[in-house]
Amino acid sequence: MSTRIVVTGTDTGIGKTVFSAALAGALDGFYWKPIQAGLDDETDTQTVLRLSGLAAERVLPEAYRLRTPASPHLAAELDGVTIEHQALLVPEKDRPLVVEGAGGLLVPLTRTITYLDLMARWRIPVVLCARTALGTINHSLLSVEALRARGVAMLGIAFIGEENVESERIITEMGKVRRLGRLPHVAPLTRDTLREAFADGFAIDDFLKGPA
């Protein structure tokens, strides 16, 4: 079985879709977002297809496409859809697969199940994406604690934003977690500029050698 990686974040809107696009492209692999909530604007899957450089068949269709940009449990209820979380099984592919979650770890999929519950069941190593802005220390360390409490293995933490040496250092030291690198805000954001920024900030082998 090839490498499978779950990308999650400390919050919503922190850049994990752009990071996932860069990672999937660098791995020349596959991408899958199981649940998309919100269809009016460009979806995360469409963003990854635009930025990753992957062929269309490498960007897998979502299991659930929900109209409302909200927590999956609410978006599903508004659409009259039941999320059958037991059927959300991570595909096995012949190349690396990047699986992107929605929001943070404790985002509800249903009234009884969170994304963290799903990750604990999958038993696939996680990359935690974290901001570098004010507030990231608390959010990041809480997320690391939550993952560890559920026995979810971490490949490490990927910072997103402008350099913040002290915050990045204290998170990795206190959290005892590997710093994978940092992806700055990229402007203009294109396939080429993203690929270059990711190559400058990360070593792809770190994503292939297993949890620290």
UniProtKB/Swiss-Prot annotation:
It holds the Pfam family AAA_26. It comes from the Bacteria. Pathway: Cofactor biosynthesis; biotin biosynthesis; biotin from 7,8-diaminononanoate: step 1/2. Its main location: cytoplasm. One of its GO terms (biological process) is biotin biosynthetic process. InterPro entries: DTB_synth_BioD, P-loop_NTPase. It is an enzyme of class 6 (ligase). SUPFAM superfamilies: P-loop containing nucleoside triphosphate hydrolases. One of its GO terms (cellular component) is cytosol. One of its GO terms (molecular function) is magnesium ion binding. Keywords: ATP-binding, Biotin biosynthesis, Cytoplasm, Ligase, Magnesium, Metal-binding, Nucleotide-binding. Transmembrane segments: none annotated. Mg(2+) binds at T17, E100. The active site is at K33. It catalyses: (7R,8S)-7,8-diammoniononanoate + CO2 + ATP = (4R,5S)-dethiobiotin + ADP + phosphate + 3 H(+). Its cofactor is Mg(2+). It is found in: Cytoplasm. Its EC number is 6.3.3.3. NCBIfam families: bioD. Catalyzes a mechanistically unusual reaction, the ATP-dependent insertion of CO2 between the N7 and N8 nitrogen atoms of 7,8-diaminopelargonic acid (DAPA, also called 7,8-diammoniononanoate) to form a ureido ring. Belongs to the dethiobiotin synthetase family. This is ATP-dependent dethiobiotin synthetase BioD. The lineage of its organism: Bacteria, Pseudomonadati, Pseudomonadota, Alphaproteobacteria, Hyphomicrobiales.
